[in-house]
Amino acid sequence: PEVIIADEPTTALDVSIQAQILALLRGLARQRGTAIMLVTHDMGVIAEIADRVGVMYAGRLVEIGPVAAVLHSAHHPYTAGLMGLIPSLSRRVERLPQISGNMPRPGEWPGGCSFHPRCPKAGPRCTIEVPAPVAVSDSMVACHLFSGGTSVVSGDLPTKEAISTRETAS
């Protein structure tokens, strides 16, 4: 296969079994020359195994880019909110942070950007129009805050060839 899809392959596993599963996935991908599409909520696993990461909210891709760029310099307000939820070992807090509001119920998606009811930066356009992905630095972001970027076709993701060409050119 050209891609191995692993949906939450390390959820609820202890650290040693998790490491074995990740090593197995890496070995299979290397041996067969395939990519791995990892579906997970575990940011530690993403940081360890992935080259690129896509962040989804309510079934829509809101940001995609190199792991380091997305994890350390998130552009989309949802991605930035997620990164802000990761507890710091160097800082003691009495209450863990959270993203305000609630996820919409399946089938009851709001109009426009699905994150707008929870977004601290939402404007009127966000309630009406679904944002098209735009190129921002090395990432693609579906957010009206970045509408001055280079537009891409809505839902269009970079191909494997485009990614390797862009990375080779850098």
Where are these regions (language model features)?
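P-loop NTP-binding/switch modules centered on Walker-like glycine-rich loops
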Residues: P1, I5-P9, L13-R95
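Short catalytic/signature loops enriched in Gly
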Residues: P66-I163, S170
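Intrinsically disordered and other compositionally biased segments
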Residues: V15, I21, G44, S154, ...
